[in-house]
Amino acid sequence: MNHFIEIRSYTLKPGTRNEFHRLFLEQAYPMLQRWNVDVVAYGPSLHDEDSYYLMRRFDSLAHRAHSEDSFYGSDEWRQGPRESIIACIEDYTEFVIELDEVTVQGLRK
């Protein structure tokens, strides 16, 4: 069975990567787990000081849309870490690819 992997590449405001990582680990990641979002991998990029990545697995494009609408529309997100996290982000790009289970497992951290 293939899965849909969303890869987000964040360009963070200069000097905010450590704070972004802390906020992700302490607040966003636990929330994603509570919302049953399968986080495959995440972390600071190795190529510069202002980049970060997030990879999430979904069963279908419809599952991704529903999951994101539910999570980002929730009071927990909007009244929780949203503003602090967004304050660190200058820009981001996302794309979705389809991968088999073996490849997805190989990407997990």
Regions found by a protein language model. Give the residues of each.
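Short, surface-exposed ligand-recognition loops at beta-strand->loop->(often short) alpha-helix junctions
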Residues: 11-21
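Short, histidine-centered active-site or binding-site loop motifs used for metal coordination
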Residues: 9-12, 46
